[in-house]
């Protein structure tokens, strides 16, 4: 048998890669193939609703602007539903529900009403102020503020005190000084600075309460101390513009070894203006858009920029008896505006009371140069 002859293989210069044979895997008909997830696992779906609500409560209570909360509503359908939970709405911060006056609409009104129904004290106070002063729904606005005041909401207590002092929404005979002092005392007990200052003036002047000058002075000093403490705790860096004294230093008088502590209200320590509450900012913007300093019908706005309250009848507010230009809804607003602005602008005029627009009987008494005792009703 002849040996087999080996043939020579001829290779070309072109390289062709080999192909792997496909393996056929039989998938049972009862098992459906798992779809590919190109975006990764959604971890939010694995978090229980209770935990998400707890996180949203923390977010809402610390929000610095409405956008912080609105962005959550725009994230997804689940977060929007959980964010509108009454537990979350009841704990929203004042800045989270701070509605702009030029953005006021039926939707924002419904949102505030929904927060009120959820039990938010801030929403009760804010919507109450808007309805009482802007929408002129006096009864409903006062009831909303009273609802917040019953739960010891300090700004609502103070606002009701201002209404009682002025008889807002009624006639001059509707003033209830004793009720105003009682509401003011409750707000002052809760640490409200304006209420402390207002109560101090009432005690000093015997306005709605037996006169007690020393106790009134103590409340005024406490109000200034709390005002300074709020600035220091807010983290604002020390600047010479507010650390310096607003008045020239008094002459040096020998004190015979006694330690003296100058009172802030006497020496006018320049601190930044307190932050305006969103409700007061809404009032100021609302009437600025609709007529500036005159809401209409001869009514006037409180001259303190951080207030925004309008008169509900002619000559309701106190007027400066030196210049007759500025008007104030309360002694607290008058004292703050004096420190911040009016003491540089106030100038006496020739008996402006003779013009026949003297208000409701306000005269000037001797003060201490800091605006604490500029206005005093005669009644």
From Swiss-Prot:
Zn(2+) 2 binds at residues 320, 323, 342, 346. The keyword Transferase does not apply. GO terms for cellular component: nucleus. Residues 41-92 form the F-box domain. A zinc finger (MYND-type) spans 304-346. Keywords: Metal-binding, Nucleus, Ubl conjugation pathway, Zinc, Zinc-finger. Zn(2+) 1 binds at residues 304, 307, 329, 333. One of its GO terms (molecular function) is zinc ion binding. It holds the Pfam family TPR_27. The keyword Transcription regulation does not apply. Coiled coil: none annotated. It comes from the Eukaryota. Residues 358-379 are annotated as: Disordered. GO terms for biological process: protein ubiquitination. It is found in: Nucleus. Pathway: Protein modification; protein ubiquitination. Part of a SCF (ASK-cullin-F-box) protein ligase complex. Interacts with SKP1A/ASK1, SKP1B/ASK2, ASK4, ASK11 and ASK13. Component of SCF(ASK-cullin-F-box) E3 ubiquitin ligase complexes, which may mediate the ubiquitination and subsequent proteasomal degradation of target proteins. The F-box is necessary for the interaction with ASK proteins. This is F-box protein At1g67340.
């Amino acid at each position: 048998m002849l040996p087999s002859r080996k043939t020579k293989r001829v290779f070309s210069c072109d390289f062709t890669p080999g192909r792997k044979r496909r393996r056929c895997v039989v998938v049972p008909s009862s098992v459906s193939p798992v779809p590919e997830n190109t975006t990764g696992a959604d971890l939010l779906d694995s978090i229980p609703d209770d935990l998400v609500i707890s996180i949203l409560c923390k977010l809402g209570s610390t929000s610095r602007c409405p956008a912080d909360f609105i962005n959550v509503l725009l994230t997804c359908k689940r977060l929007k539903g959980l964010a509108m939970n009454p537990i979350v709405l009841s704990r929203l911060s004042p800045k989270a529900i701070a509605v702009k006056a030029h953005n006021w609409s039926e939707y924002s009104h419904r949102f505030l009403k929904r927060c009120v129904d959820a039990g938010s004290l801030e929403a009760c106070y804010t919507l109450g102020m808007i309805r009482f002063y802007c929408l002129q729904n006096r009864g409903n606005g006062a009831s909303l503020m009273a609802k917040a005041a019953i739960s010891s909401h300090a700004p609502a207590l103070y606002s009701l005190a201002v209404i009682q002092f002025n008889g807002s929404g009624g006639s001059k005979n509707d003033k209830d000084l004793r009720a105003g002092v009682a509401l003011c005392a409750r707000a002052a007990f809760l640490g409200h600075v304006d209420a402390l200052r207002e109560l101090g003036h009432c005690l000093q002047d015997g306005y709605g309460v037996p006169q007690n000058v020393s106790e009134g002075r103590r409340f005024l000093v406490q109000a200034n101390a709390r005002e300074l403490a709020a600035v220091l705790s807010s983290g604002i860096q020390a600047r010479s513009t507010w650390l310096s004294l607003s008045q020239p230093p008094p002459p040096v008088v020998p004190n015979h070894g006694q330690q003296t502590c100058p009172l802030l209200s006497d020496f006018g320590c320049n601190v930044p203006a307190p932050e305006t509450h969103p409700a007061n900012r809404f009032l100021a913007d609302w009437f600025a858009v609709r007529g500036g300093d005159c809401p209409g019908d001869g009514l006037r706005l409180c001259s303190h920029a951080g207030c925004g309250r309008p008169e509900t009848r002619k000559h309701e507010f106190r007027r400066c008896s030196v210049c007759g230009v500025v008007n104030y809804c309360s002694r607290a607003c008058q004292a703050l505006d004096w420190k911040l602005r009016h003491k540089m602008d106030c100038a006496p005029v020739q008996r402006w009371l003779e013009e026949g627009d003297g208000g409701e009987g306000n005269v000037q008494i001797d003060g201490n140069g800091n605006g604490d005792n500029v206005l005093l009703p005669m009644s």
